[in-house]
Structure formats: C-alpha cells, structure tokens
Amino acid sequence: MNLILMGLPGAGKGTQAEQIVAKYNIPHISTGDMFRAAMKAETELGLQAKSFIDKGALVPDEVTIGIVRERLSQEDCKKGFLLDGFPRTVAQASALEEIMKDLGKKIDYVLNINVDSGLLLKRLTGRRICKECGATYHLEFNPPAKADVCDKCGGELYQRSDDNEETVANRLEVNIKQTKPLLDFYEELGYLQSINGEQDINKVFADIDVLIGGLA
C-alpha cells in the first residue's frame, strides 16, 4: 500500500501515522527524516540539501524530489510506504507521479484528515506548558488538577507565544490556502479520501483501517 497522509496542524496526523505503520509494517516517511538520512549517508543529494539547510535556505524542488526518488526506491518501500509532509505543492505531486510511474507503482490513497478549523483552533490554543519542568497540558483534553499549576512539580503553566489565537488562526489560514490546490489535484486523480478527524482517535483509525485494509 502506497499512502500519502495529509491534514492541517492539530488534525492528529502523527497519532494516525503511528497506528498505520505499526499495524501494516510500512515505513513512515517524512521530509525531515529523508533529509536527515540522506545527509547522514552523505549522498550527493544529501550533501546538496545540507548546503542549503546550513545557509537557512529552502531546499530546491529538484533536490527534494531526487531524495524522495532515492528513498522510495529502497528495499523497505517494496511493500508500501506512508508519505507525510510530501508533496506540499502540485509541482511536487506531479513529480511524485513520475517517480511512481518509473518505479512501476501508483499511489493508492491520499488520506486527508478533516477537522473543522474552529475545532483545530481550540485544540492548538489550549496547550499549556510548565515553566519549571516542561510538562505539557491541554485546557480541554488534558487539564491540570489545579488551574495554571503543574501536577508534577507545582510550577506555573504558560501559553507559548506561537500558540495564541491570532498566530494559530493565521497559520491555519496559510495552510488551508496552500493545501487546497493539492487536494484538488488528488481529487481529480481519484486518490483523495476524506477522513473525519473530529471523532475519537480510535474511531479515526478504525475508519482508515476499513479503507486501507483491502490493500494489505
């Protein structure tokens, strides 16, 4: 099974990715992991990527796509993979189609975990962190026993500046705009599957499992 996982920040992609790879024993491939592995192995493309990253510059598409091609050609991807964080643009998605064609494979599904932006805002702005020990809480989903006080060490809880409502709302808006052309592209190809991410996390996985189970 060859899968792509999509979803806005706070949609619960990480949790679902863990469950998919654990059950189906396929590699979870994120852009960051690919870059790190290529740089560590000092491949030609890895060294090129490193030169851009060290300068604080974006890695050009041709380098990223080359690294993706190398990674998907590896032995552990023979039975499938879960791509996360790539592609990000229609140009990258088109390049991925070419890679898959060259490898004699195709993408089976693009799983988009759908969550209303209002709920995402609540999920992302509710996080609180202990100033002393770094423990993480959530006002709704994992609240401390006593408001603003860490259960573990009694330290004061605070909200990170980039978790405030305005910053999070802007981040979501940018993500929605960037993601829409990609979703349209995959819908046209017939790969796109929308998953209700507003349910309990086990129910979300059960829905994914029913969908992809036939591919195993």
UniProtKB/Swiss-Prot annotation:
One of its GO terms (cellular component) is cytoplasm. It is found in: Cytoplasm. Its EC number is 2.7.4.3. It catalyses: AMP + ATP = 2 ADP. Zn(2+) binds at residues 130, 133, 150, 153. Keywords: ATP-binding, Cytoplasm, Kinase, Metal-binding, Nucleotide biosynthesis, Nucleotide-binding, Transferase, Zinc. Residues 126-163 are annotated as: LID. GO terms for biological process: AMP salvage. AMP binds at residues 31, 36, 57-59, 85-88, 92, 160, 171. Pathway: Purine metabolism; AMP biosynthesis via salvage pathway; AMP from ADP: step 1/1. One of its GO terms (molecular function) is zinc ion binding. Belongs to the adenylate kinase family. Catalyzes the reversible transfer of the terminal phosphate group between ATP and AMP. Plays an important role in cellular energy homeostasis and in adenine nucleotide metabolism. Monomer. PANTHER family: NUCLEOTIDE KINASE. Consists of three domains, a large central CORE domain and two small peripheral domains, NMPbind and LID, which undergo movements during catalysis. The LID domain closes over the site of phosphoryl transfer upon ATP binding. Assembling and dissambling the active center during each catalytic cycle provides an effective means to prevent ATP hydrolysis. Some bacteria have evolved a zinc-coordinating structure that stabilizes the LID domain. This is Adenylate kinase. It comes from Bacillus cytotoxicus (strain DSM 22905 / CIP 110041 / 391-98 / NVH 391-98).
